[in-house]
C-alpha cells in the first residue's frame, strides 16, 4: 500500500510537469511585452525601436513595447520583477538600473536588480553627447567652461530622473572640468531633450542617437562626445581626451540589456537570448545602428550580469567619493 501511494505521488508530480513542459515548448505562442522604464523619445526607447521588428521576427512573435516611466525607472523595474516568470514580460534596461543601485544603496522597496532579475543578454552601447541650448553663448566646450565661470553654480542641466545616465554622467564631466551645476529632473530622457531644445535648461547629456537629429535640425549644439575617438556620425564634435578632461573610471555611455523576472524557466530565457543574438548579428540591424554610432555588441546573460555588477561597484565609488545624495 505504501509503495502504491509513493507511485501515485510520483505520477502526480510528473503529470504536473507536463503543462509546464508543453508551455515551454510552445513558447512564444502570444505577443511578448517588452517594458521600457522611460517615456518615448529617450535613449532606451529610441534604441529598442531600432531593433524591435527584427527581434520579433527572430522570436517568431509580435512584440508590444510598453513605456512605463516614473520614479527614475523604479516603477517599471519593480513591475516587471513582480510579473509572472513566463517569458511574456521582458525588461528593456539601460545602465541606469545599476547606477540607481549605486546611488540609493538600499531602496525602500527592497528592489535589487541582481536579486530580482535573470539576465538574458547585452545588446549594445552608444556614447553620449554634451548638448547645450542655442541660447547658451558657447560654440565649443572650452567656451562653455569659460561661460560657466560667469554663472558659477547657477546654470542647470536636465536629466531623465535621479540615478539615470543623463543624471550621473554630467556629474562626472562637471567634476573633471571643474564646474558646478544644478540638476533638473524630468520624467524621462525625451522630455529632457525637448527642454534643452527649447532653451529651458542649459545642458542635457543625450545618447548620440537622440542628439544627432537634434544637432542636424539646429535645435541644440553638441560640444563633447564621450567615445574614445571622434564619432563618424558627428565628426565635428571632440572627445573628452582631446579636450584634456580626466574623468572617473565609470562607463560614460548608454548600454542596454534584456532581463526577465527571477526564476524564469531556462529554456524560455535561452530562446529570448538566442533571438537577441540573431538580431544583433543581423546585417540590417547593424547597418541601421551604425548610422547613429551605436555598437550592436551582443553578450550572453552571465556577461551582462558581470557588467551590471561592475557598474554598481564603479559608480558606488564615484558617488560615495563625491557625496552625491538624492532624497528617496
Residue positions per predicted region:
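Positively charged n-region of N-terminal signal peptides that target proteins for export
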Residues: 1-4
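C-terminal lobe and pocket-closing loops
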Residues: 125, 211-281, 313, 327
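N-terminal (or domain-start) structured segment
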Residues: 23-116, 153-154, 162, 166, ...
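Residue-level signature of catalytic and energy-coupling elements of molecular machines
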Residues: 144, 196, 315
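Short secondary-structure boundary segments
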Residues: 94-95, 134, 207-209, 227-228, ...
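An extracytoplasmic/periplasmic, membrane-proximal ligand-sensing/linker region
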Residues: 29-31, 175-179, 242, 266-328
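Hinge/capping helix and adjacent helix->loop/strand transition within the periplasmic-binding protein
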Residues: 79-88, 101-191, 240-242, 255-288
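Bacterial N-terminal signal peptides
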Residues: 7-19
